[in-house]
């Protein structure tokens, strides 16, 4: 049995444990009184704050129950926000405004037992950062840098999320044959460490108020090495342990949903593990992988498939890192996740259930400590839900998806722009997308006064139960096939995603899935935006090629030595990331990719 099979057993065992605690609370008077006293104490110590109109509200909303069995069901089955099994949130206060007027003390007495293996849970209060993180990347590094400064001009914390162009995603240099017209299209062109310096110019990379997220997987270790090299150029080597951020680096989802993989699967996983081994030891604030369901969802999966494949991929990575000898409490806290949020009913509780399954699986199948149990989540509203027909409706779609994302207590969120069916978003529509989050979190009172404002309804509970059961069924099928890697090689996830995508399109075609303005309530008018499509001017593309040529000429001898050393380390089977760091100082992305492919080969895309 693989670890995934153990996770299924762990969740089933924990659910039985919860039922046992419910029965015990009803039959054991002493235990029942202890639970009632703990519940009453928590409620009594919950601060009371006031809305702008003066209405008093508890800072933590709890169900009004006094029956010991139901208290046990809540404390053990759900947990308070920030407590195992984290159904209601990774941290205690998430999006709440800083405390101003408090009439009572702070809540926080933890349950005396969190399951069959008692461990203190939680990770302290959440850092005071805005959860908004907008995705951006266009033309050359300096153009994206300008957009970054525009997006963060009103934010206390600078949380940048970077999109790369096609050549960069495939590890190809801008001067490669057939690439010229694709430079800077749909993302930023990054060929060298010098580009990386330009990309984040003006930001203090070592500041606790800065973090960078880089959406790239195939050449992720190379891009990560360039980011470290750029940081060292600007701030010196002592900045490395201070760097905060995420690189996506999710090879499994690439093979399952995208095909943006440049090395064979086993080699890709080896390079990833080399990077994780280095960063978890040397960069304690960095997340070296973002286990991503977003692309799985955008490729056409059902919500349950998205969550199941993402979680199973995560457990497979954890098993792989542990096999390398990396301690679970070293890599566990540095794993992060990325999910899509659409409009189907499953999204009401998809992330909540995922958080619970991850916590139980990591604790009971991997023996992870409290910090390694946390499902730290970035959510993005659904790009697939945005359509060109009557495109202004996309504002409402995204607003509804934002509501669902924050109901699930996501740690950070990107809201898509309404004009994305046509082009790389313009500043006008990006501003509206960002303001959508600000209105929800800062202007409205839905999330800023009270934790658990919208959780716990009978409908949400029904969705949670159904989604968890469906995810475990997906786990069982993957386990039957021999685990995640075997299923990937058998194209199982990919074929299931393709089948789901076909059903989705068929439902739109036959009208069983209504899309307002497309197959229902059409007004017949063309309201396409009158905006200029985002294109990289040829002179900018030529500038990128010229810069790259100059860099290669300047570093020709050093690059040869560094690349020879890198190849030697790879052939000896050692951790190649330190050698990759040296190569990133003097070699281009394409040069490094090319030499590594000479050693390990190329990935054959799956269809």
Region spans (language model):
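A short glycine/serine-rich beta->alpha loop
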Residues: 210-216, 299-303, 385-390, 421-424, ...
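Short hydrophobic/aromatic segments of transmembrane alpha-helices and their interfaces
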Residues: 178-180, 299, 394-395, 442, ...
